[in-house]
Swiss-Prot record:
Span list, region Interaction with the K-D-E-L motif on target proteins: 47-48, 159-169
Function recorded in the entry: Membrane receptor that binds the K-D-E-L sequence motif in the C-terminal part of endoplasmic reticulum resident proteins and maintains their localization in that compartment by participating to their vesicle-mediated recycling back from the Golgi. Binding is pH dependent, and is optimal at pH 5-5.4.
Species of provenance: Homo sapiens (Human)
Residues the UniProt record annotates as site (Important for recycling of cargo proteins with the sequence motif K-D-E-L from the Golgi to the endoplasmic reticulum): 193
Site residues, Interaction with the K-D-E-L motif on target proteins: 5, 54, 117
Stated consequence of mutating residue 133 to L: In OI21; uncertain significance
Keyword Cytoplasm: no
Segments passing through the bilayer: 5-24, 33-52, 59-79, 93-110, 117-135, 150-168, 179-199
Family statement drawn from the similarity comment of this UniProt entry: Belongs to the ERD2 family.
Membrane topology according to the record: Multi-pass membrane protein
GO cellular component terms given for this protein: cis-Golgi network; COPI-coated vesicle membrane; endoplasmic reticulum; endoplasmic reticulum membrane; Golgi membrane; membrane; transport vesicle
Region (Important for recycling of cargo proteins with the sequence motif K-D-E-L from the Golgi to the endoplasmic reticulum) residue spans: 204-207
Protein's recorded name: ER lumen protein-retaining receptor 2
Amino acid sequence: MNIFRLTGDLSHLAAIVILLLKIWKTRSCAGISGKSQLLFALVFTTRYLDLFTSFISLYNTSMKVIYLACSYATVYLIYLKFKATYDGNHDTFRVEFLVVPVGGLSFLVNHDFSPLEILWTFSIYLESVAILPQLFMISKTGEAETITTHYLFFLGLYRALYLVNWIWRFYFEGFFDLIAVVAGVVQTILYCDFFYLYITKVLKGKKLSLPA
């Protein structure tokens, strides 16, 4: 494992922990898109079905379990424990416009036409767009809490670091996964505008807002 994948994983984990702590400490999920969190839970569920069929390393298995547990915990907090604070009026992105095309694409473009491989491909495609309901929600409300922007920053940083990881692996290991790379590029592009606003506003103590 190279340093870029490790730091990418740590950034991803940091984003998840920040979100969970934000919800738990404030006893509120205001400003958080439950739909994005449902999509991420679906991403991890379909990606890590091989948890029961293959073992790569203790680190790999541990991270899979952590991602699954945290994603389910987040969904539980939003839709059950702190349901009264969930802003469903602004979380209105039509997720079927993401899930259906992604599902079709995973059947058409994959590495191998087997159930686990198709589901893995589905998870890669879906992860690249799963943040859209959250960004859409921010654009509707006009701004985001600082802690929410920190969550989004680390989530975007994780994907950017993984792009560097793939470049590293291509040059030093000869490994290249076109599906993962293209999906990662799409996901990183979605974060570009947010990164700019994060650096120019949030780091200077200002509120972040996305254009409606």
